[in-house]
Amino acid sequence: MRDPDALIARAGVRGDPERDQHFLVDNRVLDRLPGYLPDDADTSHVLEIGGGTGGLTDRLLSAAYRVTVVERDPTLAAFLREEFTEEIEADRLSVIEGDALEIELPSFTASVSNLPYGVSSEIAFRLLPAGRPLVLMFQLEFAERMAAAPGTDEYGRLSVT
């Protein structure tokens, strides 16, 4: 597995909170995420939104037959294409440069993503109609609103759906 800190160093970037970039670097979390898909999930084509420097992408390639990454940052999309050249040439990985809220998303059998915090609800609502298994990482406050019980301050549109 590729080391997430080494990927960030090779990419020559830092997460930029103002651009909603938060890179996941905890190997324990990265290693577990693909395993949260249901045991019977079809992993023939997994979609990742916000590939960043590829820490999760690398893990998904070990768990899925094919992965498509949507990355809106041109620098990071170019880095992913360079870092994962072999996987792209083997037709196991596609990198789409674009905003997941604006582009036409490819068909997929499951999605595992560390979503950009500022648009996590919009992306989640975009993925849900596909009816496919989703493993989505959210900011804690967002997750609390999503799981809120009726009558609590956090209860709202996210809780109802």
Predicted regions and their residues:
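Catalytic cores of RNA-modifying enzymes
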Residues: 1-161
